[in-house]
Amino acid sequence: MNKYAIGLDFGTNSCRSLIVNLSNGDEISSHVFNYPSGQAGVVINSSDPNQARQNPADYLLGIEITIKEAIKKARVLVPDFSPHDIVGIGVDTTGSSPLPVDEKGTPLCFIKKFENNPSAMVWLWKDHTSYNEAQRITEAASKTRPDYLSRIGGTYSSEWYWSKIWHCSKENPEVFNAAYSFVEICDWIPAVLVGETNPDLIKRSICAAGHKAMFSNKWGGFPDTVFLESLSPGLGKLRGHLANKAYSAEERAGYLSAGWAEKLGLSTNVSVAVGAFDAHMGAVGAGIKKGTLVKIVGTSTCDIMISPNNKTLSDIPGVCGIVDGSVMNGYYGIEAGQSAVGDIFLWFVNHLVPDIYGKTREEKFSNLEKAAAKLKPGESGLLALDWNNGNRTILVDVRLTGLILGQTLYTQPHEIYRALVEATAFGALTIIDRIEEYGVDINEVVNCGGLAIKNSMLMQIYADVTNRPMKISRSEQTPALGAAIFGAVSAGKEISGYENLEKAQKSMTGISKTYLPINENHLIYRKLYSLYHLVHDSFGTVKQSGNLYNVMKELLDIRDNVRKDNVC
């Protein structure tokens, strides 16, 4: 008899349920639900482009619809399938995406007084309203608690837990004062499923706490009350409602509550794993192991690595955290990333590409890629910075913006499109160089996510720029697959057949395709990358005082040489 697990994947605009066969990793059915609230699921503010909130009611509706529909499909596709053979559920979400709740764990936006109040909703990962608070946290911790910053790259981000909560206290003191606690949605959703939403009893994820909330066992868990209160009066009160322990997603949050079991048609014996972020579970779904860099390439990109925790690992400036157990037990999880990748391409197509490339967005993307793929590296004479949504790694600065150099009166849209793709590849190489600079060897790169699977030009450019093979994960839904794997492991060996993640990964993950670097392309990209590096440091760092006089001229020289070779 086959056994199954469900992976629940909560993304920026939608959620999905994936049902996986535990014996071989076959993804037998899935269903996607687009969040109905706001604009594509995000509650925005036309007067403040930094705001990005989410309605948690969308998650609850999404759980019910996607699981029921996935089960319905599974019954059709697999004749002997029964929902009673589902033994585990894993949950991944975006993050840091904290939610203000009352003492029962009820979201404040569910209370009539705060209904439709964005401050009482989920503060989505890409909400950048708290950039000032993030800077002040960095300054304060640097002076009085430097250890708090040492394992998160040296800089606190506006995308993270404490900066958002602090900003909430200024933006809407009434909401802040009504909040008993702020709970990451990767913690709240499993708590809802098991029927234990008391903030004092929720099992908080080490993934979220360690990477985004300055949690470490070295100083007793979350930041101390004195430090928090020194930032802003009132912040310290929240510390009393945060436990001193955080949990790996390999552990069980509890069993599916009777209410949810009845609603979904499942057993109350279904194990629900502790939650984690989508990238970290996606890395497991992509088969991460020591020496493997997993890139989850989508609207943004998150890079994940692991390193054995029985060996000393140096702090790495500019990364989003080095956290013991955030990906797998026995390993430090290393997180880095780029704030926008697919979102840059989407912005360009939505706003700047003329209709000669197509009438619909899909036609424009298709024709742009066909035209851009015919170009040689350097042929356009363009160089871009991939900072349209700020820089996450290695500069950790949301106040940086995009840039395109080298345009002339003859520059074509597909040339700009390729330059934007190349910019994201240069950003990826910058992260690789930083990680290896601090002693972590990268033996292979595995890519997953929609862009990695669908855009062969992008993956070939990444291979050429980095001079490394780019492997593509077998699964097109790696975060959901990773969540299902965690759900299975949380059920225990006697139930699921797996006692740890490594054994589950071997049976349930794999590689579908590999892009090999082309040496002649790499040689040109080395020249372009040196210019990118100069521009990157000149605009992104205080210390760099390099002269940019030759950048445009060198771009033209590279362009002319490539075009001359094409004619020959």
Model-found features: residue ranges?
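Gly/Ser/Thr-rich active-site cleft segment
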Residues: 10-12, 101, 138-139, 143-274, ...
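Conserved active-site "lid/cap" helical segment
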Residues: 45-85, 164, 168-179
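Buried hydrophobic packing segments
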Residues: 66, 161-168, 193, 202-204, ...
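Conserved active-site beta-strand element of glycosyltransferases/polysaccharide synthases
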Residues: 295, 304
